[in-house]
């Protein structure tokens, strides 16, 4: 079953953010756009390249009013150790959620049960807590934060402009579509 257009479930997890341990719940996402950026494990190979890419785009995400939560089934203590030992991960200013029980990962139907690891997946959640976009890739395929930004801008545009949709490769400032009977067969 697809989770698109479904509300995120309640959760409560510990996270590492800006040198501190914090608690994060679904209430922290209310009224804000959120990205849940799941990855298999700390101290691995593709994961730090992705998390570093998101860190490099974090300022732009913040300007869009987006909170970022990276999530793995590691503990928040492991996240702190990784943050302290990796130059790439040390750039991260967003919350790194620990999910050692896998409850949050399962809430997003994103657990590899046989391994106890999260799949490599991104969920864009609107201010009402509704999932608007999902991207899942195989373990060896890294995600691109530039495309994540494009998808967030498209989701925000569509939310602010009912009746309009963003076509493939849409970028901010480009033409959108207004689906109607007149458009059928003309695109």
UniProtKB/Swiss-Prot annotation:
Residues forming the catalytic site: 47 (cysteine sulfenic acid (-soh) intermediate)
Catalytic activity: a hydroperoxide + NADH + H(+) = an alcohol + NAD(+) + H2O
Enzyme class, spelled out: oxidoreductase
GO CC field: cytosol
One Pfam family matching this protein: AhpC-TSA
Subcellular location(s) of the protein: Cytoplasm
Enzyme Commission code(s) on record: 1.11.1.26
Molecular function via GO: NADH-dependent peroxiredoxin activity; thioredoxin peroxidase activity
BP GO terms, sorted: cell redox homeostasis; hydrogen peroxide catabolic process; response to oxidative stress
Domain Thioredoxin, first and last residues per copy: 2-157
Coarse class of the protein's main subcellular location: cytoplasm
Keywords: Antioxidant, Cytoplasm, Disulfide bond, Oxidoreductase, Peroxidase, Redox-active center
Entry keyword annotation includes Disulfide bond: yes
Stored PANTHER family: ALKYL HYDROPEROXIDE REDUCTASE C (PTHR10681:SF121), THIOREDOXIN PEROXIDASE (PTHR10681)
Family the UniProt entry places it in: Belongs to the peroxiredoxin family. AhpC/Prx1 subfamily.
NCBIfam families in alphabetical order: AhpC
Additional notes on this entry: The active site is a conserved redox-active cysteine residue, the peroxidatic cysteine (C(P)), which makes the nucleophilic attack on the peroxide substrate. The peroxide oxidizes the C(P)-SH to cysteine sulfenic acid (C(P)-SOH), which then reacts with another cysteine residue, the resolving cysteine (C(R)), to form a disulfide bridge. The disulfide is subsequently reduced by an appropriate electron donor to complete the catalytic cycle. In this typical 2-Cys peroxiredoxin, C(R) is provided by the other dimeric subunit to form an intersubunit disulfide.
Subunit structure: Homodimer; disulfide-linked, upon oxidation. 5 homodimers assemble to form a ring-like decamer.
Known role: Thiol-specific peroxidase that catalyzes the reduction of hydrogen peroxide and organic hydroperoxides to water and alcohols, respectively. Plays a role in cell protection against oxidative stress by detoxifying peroxides.
Protein name from the UniProt record: Alkyl hydroperoxide reductase C
Annotated organism of origin: Salmonella typhimurium (strain LT2 / SGSC1412 / ATCC 700720)
Lineage of origin: Bacteria, Pseudomonadati, Pseudomonadota, Gammaproteobacteria, Enterobacterales
Gene designation per UniProt: ahpC
